Amino acid sequence: GYSSAASDVYKRQLVDADYSQIELRVLASMAEDQTMIDAFNSGADIHTATAAQVFGLPPEMITPQLRSRAKAVNFGIVYGIGAFSLAKDIGVSNKEAKEYIDSYMHTYQGVAAYMQRMIDAAKDTGYATTLFGRRRYLPELAASNHMLRAFGERVARNMPIQGTAADIIKIAMVRVDRRLYAEEMESRLILQVHDELIVEAPEAEADRALQIVTEEMEHACNMAVLLRADGKIGQTWYDAH
């Protein structure tokens, strides 16, 4: 469960904002995949939209079970898992899982091409890189061992996505911190956990702090897909979730 870490100094509140599906938004933008970009920017639910495409059904016919399968495919692509792992995760046969992945790659052809470009570029240079130029060297790509090479290819595909998302949250942290100081507020950024930021705010500042955190997170990087941050205010971290 979540920590009930409380904040009771001078009746302070915790303001918590987290990115909505940042890695998939980064993927759509970096891959310049118009189908996925349009789905995000139209406000559609990306997992339902993916399910409709992969299973060949209209969105209104997508059941929670189909949506959750599509969600596993979406994140499976980001984390570079293959048909075998996907099959285990969602309880289908390897053959069916492979069909889902193939159908996904057919739907989001920009993503498929991008993944291949990332592998080729990493083989060429010896490293994978984020949108901001941070590198991860991949000697595994030149290994004679097949398992090591496969690992290197997986990292070459997903490090640019996960790494860029990690870069963006760090940029957001700097922006939030600067803005709170610039507006002479007492609120302070106290914690970053994965894709969320937590600010401790005096009660009177909480609403404004929430507005600042979400604004700065959403403007941390200018990409083809708009970033979205959802925030809440609470007495404890648990409440603010």
Protein language model regions, located:
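Conserved catalytic core of nucleic-acid polymerases
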Residues: A52-M185, L191-Q192, P202, K232-H241
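Short active-site loop/helix that positions an aromatic residue
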Residues: S20-E32
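Cytochrome P450 catalytic domain signature, combining two hallmark sequence patches
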Residues: A31-N41
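Short hydrophobic beta-strand that contains or immediately precedes a catalytic carboxylate
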Residues: L14-D18
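C-terminal structured "cap/appendage" subdomains that terminate the fold
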Residues: V176-D230
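Conserved nucleotide-binding/hydrolysis micro-motifs of P-loop NTPases
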Residues: S20-I22, E196, T236-Y238
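Single conserved hydrophobic/aromatic residue that forms the stacking wall/gate
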Residues: G1-A6, Y10
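Hydrophobic (often cysteine-bearing) scaffold residues that line and stabilize catalytic clefts
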Residues: Y2, E23, G43, H47, ...
